[in-house]
Amino acid sequence: MKFDSGDIVIAVLHSPREKLLGVLDSIEAAGVTMRSIDLGYFDDWCSSIVAGEAHLEMTDNFYPMWRVERLSRDESSDDLPSMADQFETRTGRRLG
């Protein structure tokens, strides 16, 4: 599977365990660079944006390859919308 810069991805990292939703910048032998938020914050993040409340922004980060357990493209599946589609439906904004 080929990933491109700008793809919306879900990254699972270890040591410590993290799940991130973000916009991929690059993948290199050394690691992954992406603009992301913690996936556990997604619902609160969307709610805060809709309510016009203060919220954390996506941040640019580099994750060394030894921490990357899995990288998946954020895609819809059957009746389940992608995280990016859910974000757009809930906030009226595009992710990325």
Which residue ranges define each predicted feature?
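Conserved RNA-binding domains used in RNP assembly and mRNA/RNA metabolism
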Residues: 1-96
